Amino acid sequence: MKNYSLTKVPSQVQLELASRFREIRRDKKVSQSQLANKSGVSLGSIKRFEQTGQISLESLLKLAHLFDRLSDFDAIFKIDADLKSIAKLFS
């Protein structure tokens, strides 16, 4: 019997993110070389990201900015009102 998890592991998230990025790039008809020239991210970094999901945060943010997706990162580590209320209980 296999054990299944409803949560993803980081490597899964990386690969899914890379796949979605590649799809967006292709939909916009932008080559990897063009993207490297416009973003300041090296061609090697872009290729590695699309193949393995590995990229520095700075490079990922540059690429997101180029495709007007930088705001997608706003929700990461955002503390919502419920968490602030809970934190007050323990302070």
Where on the chain are the PLM-derived regions?
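Short, highly charge-biased, low-complexity peptide segments
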Residues: A64-K78
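Short, charged recognition helix plus adjacent turn
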Residues: N3, D74-S91
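A short, Lys/Arg-rich alpha-helix, primarily the initiator
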Residues: K2-D27, I76
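Short alpha-helical DNA-recognition segment
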Residues: K29-K47
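Short, basic-rich loop-to-helix N-cap that marks the start of a DNA-contacting helix
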Residues: T52-H65
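Residue-level signal for the short linker/turn that defines the boundary of a DNA-recognition helix
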Residues: S19, K29-S31, E58
